[in-house]
Amino acid sequence: MLPRTKYNRFRNDSVTSVDDLLHSLSVSGGGGKVSAARATPAAAPYLVSGEALRKAPDDGPGSLGHLLHKVSHLKLSSSGLRGLSSAARERAGARLSGSCSAPSLAAPDGSAPSAPRAPAMSAARKGRPGDEPLPRPPRGAPHASDQVLGPGVTYVVKYLGCIEVLRSMRSLDFSTRTQITREAISRVCEAVPGAKGAFKKRKPPSKMLSSILGKSNLQFAGMSISLTISTASLNLRTPDSKQIIANHHMRSISFASGGDPDTTDYVAYVAKDPVNRRACHILECCDGLAQDVIGSIGQAFELRFKQYLQCPTKIPALHDRMQSLDEPWTEEEGDGSDHPYYNSIPSKMPPPGGFLDTRLKPRPHAPDTAQFAGKEQTYYQGRHLGDTFGEDWQQTPLRQGSSDIYSTPEGKLHVAPTGEAPTYVNTQQIPPQAWPAAVSSAESSPRKDLFDMKPFEDALKNQPLGPVLSKAASVECISPVSPRAPDAKMLEELQAETWYQGEMSRKEAEGLLEKDGDFLVRKSTTNPGSFVLTGMHNGQAKHLLLVDPEGTIRTKDRVFDSISHLINHHLESSLPIVSAGSELCLQQPVERKQ
């Protein structure tokens, strides 16, 4: 065995010939002999072209460039890399051929070049699909937009539970949010039997994380569920019984994370609901499914924001959209004698022209949600309407003063009677010409956090208020969660019940209640197609909407076939209807007067 020649920068290249160099390479590669004479590919592991034997005119003797120039023209054959896999063989050939600045030429002896070997190698790779994973769809758009905008994308995942988050995620930076989700994943994995631990050796949590994370809810831990992601909500339900475990509107989701290197099989998102308040929900997504799930959630957020930009609707005030979840969102409040908004800023003066001139300006005007104070205030069971992000860019009736703004005839709300509509002296109107520039800057601005909702606030602050849309004007921007009209079968079934009063106002219904346990079901006068359960508990009247925007009759715990099924179930079993921490017991039905 010949000793391998070492390269020395002080060595004169004229001492060592090219044959010695190729001989040392052949000994280290496969033991075959290399010569400039005619040779077959099977006998020589390296084929040397004629250009490789020529000396580059620019490279002086003994230079490193001269050596690299010769080695770069060496072509690999399959015999020298027999022990490597197909993928490693391809990478090695690409690296060696890629280092050459000039194209490789065929050997002058007529031997076949290595280029025709590429199809054989690719065919071998096709025959061995286990060498490389199958290609995945791009992260930006993993599914068709119509599917996410419509019924949604469904995944079968494992629900591990949730942990209460005691602080608003909006008040924390991106790094802290990520630490919270990682800590929540670790705690749930340790508490759920059979769950794969996210971290084998986990450091004890810091005091800050311990103060942010609260109690855990493991009621449905370890259950296989169907996760449906759409622009409307994230719906978690059992595949067999279709029992709803959680249904979080996109506006109630403040942060989502998943597919990190150390938590590759887990997705965590923070959302608000009336059962768990603000909580971090953990999903186990095996076989690389976490990347697809988190990509679909991000796509739903992006499409939802684009939908809002294309079809902006009435925008509630910021302090209305940021009300606390602690308020009982499923219950109605009493009528206010005075308007809740009263401009009492001492240093502000009304604009010239007085109150009437301000209202009669031709500029577009959208009445505030509190303008309808005193009318019926309706909430959806199992839906959270008091969160950070209101239903700003979907045509859903947001009930704060409980009047459906899309059921009001067009033109009647442009000029309100004197003394009813509030006027503001500190408003600022942005010209319509400035709106496209604001939208383009918001889209082009870099966002480190994919689920950071700050662009929504910026768009809301810069969005000019448009006129109130009627039903005829809102056909082009139909909401996927708009209330459905009741069918004839439901109305016929309700007419047979003695506790159904028909169409009745809130005030009239409260007048029929005398003691705790009295209840009735009525058809709302301000919200067409809505049915309200009115009952008395602890001497106070409560009003609950029985049908959600999708037309499902449900409470937060169960889905029912009809309104009669819901009422009779709670009446016969004496089970209270729980909503936002309070209870409503159905004991004595208020019968309809004939």
UniProtKB/Swiss-Prot annotation:
Q: Which stretches are tagged as biased composition: Low complexity? A: 101-124
One term under GO cellular component: cytosol
Q: Which GO terms describe its molecular function?
A: phosphotyrosine residue binding; receptor tyrosine kinase binding
In this chain, the stretch annotated as CH1 covers: 335-498
Q: Where is this region: Disordered?
A: 98-147, 351-373, 386-405
What CDD domains does the annotation carry? Answer: PTB_Shc, SH2_SHC
Q: Which keywords does UniProt give here?
A: Phosphoprotein, SH2 domain
UniProt domain PID: residue ranges? 149-334
Question: Could you tell me the Gene Ontology terms of the biological process aspect for this record?
Answer: cell surface receptor protein tyrosine kinase signaling pathway; central nervous system development; epidermal growth factor receptor signaling pathway; intracellular signal transduction
Q: Is Transmembrane helix given among the entry's keywords?
A: no
Known InterPro entries for this protein?
Answer: CEP152/SHC-Transforming, PH-like_dom_sf, PID_Shc-like, PTB/PI_dom, SH2, SH2_dom_sf, SHC_SH2
Q: How is it modified after translation?
A: Tyrosine phosphorylated.
Q: What does this protein do?
A: Signaling adapter that couples activated growth factor receptors to signaling pathway in neurons. Involved in the signal transduction pathways of neurotrophin-activated Trk receptors in cortical neurons.
The subunit structure is: Interacts with the Trk receptors in a phosphotyrosine-dependent manner. Once activated, binds to GRB2. Interacts with activated EGF receptors.
Q: Which PANTHER family match?
A: SHC TRANSFORMING PROTEIN, SHC-TRANSFORMING PROTEIN 3
> What protein am I looking at?
SHC-transforming protein 3
